[in-house]
Structures are given as structure tokens and as C-alpha cells.
Amino acid sequence: MFFFLLAALAWDGEKISRSDAEWKNILGQNRYNVMRRKTSEGAFLGKYVLTETKGTYSCAGCSLALFSSEDKYQAKVGWPTFTQPIAPKNVFYLEDFSMGFKRYEVLCRKCDAHLGHVFHDGPPIKYLRYCINSIALQFEPN
């Protein structure tokens, strides 16, 4: 049954394309800065850093399901952290050297929004830590 749930949440449609002015109007300045200009919110300031409620985290720009609370854990790094996306097809990655070292930016597949970064220092089995900006997410409790 879990497989069917993931298949239903995987996105396979057309991308959303909007102008910068439209995105700024839809998202507001703070979300726009993070999701379109690729900044980060301050550590431990985000709404979902300590949230333990069960549910689904979706893109604040297009509502695409991105992460499940089942994959969330407390890494104590200042941002919500997950071991994997809810469906691999729902995100994509770009190499990012903006901090002087190689890391991988995580973006929403549907609207190209910057979500955060993934690192290879997470818990076993996959050893991945998706470090995601709270402001790029909207949460729907189960």
C-alpha cells in the first residue's frame, strides 16, 4: 500500500513558468528571496525546524508534495532535515559551489524553486541529509 501512496504523490506533469514579478507577488519578499534568489533563512528561525507532527511537506510555490514527516529527523543543524524526498521524481539537483565547496542544491521539479541542499552525512542506510528551508515548505498534517 505504501508503494501506491508514493506513486500517487509522484509528479509527472508540466512545469510552472512565471515571471520574477509574478513569483514575488505570489510568494512575498522573504519566500521569494529563498525560493527564487536561492538565499537561506536563518538557522533555527524556521517554522518547521522542531515540528514532530505527522504529515506531508509540500512546495510553498506550487503545492507539490516533497517530504514526509516519516522521513524527518532532528539533525540539530537549524533547518528541517529529511532522509529522502517523498518521491524521487519530485525534486532535482544542481551542483552548487557558492560557498567555496561542492554541495548539491535541491529544487522543486514542478516550479524550479530552491528548497535547500542535500549532504552525504545523514543517518544510515542512505546517509543523506536533506537540509530544507522551512519557508520553502507548507505543511499538511495527517
Where are these regions (language model features)?
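Hydrophobic h-region of N-terminal signal peptides that target proteins for export
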Residues: 2-10
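A short Gly-Trp-Pro
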Residues: 14-20, 24-58, 64-142
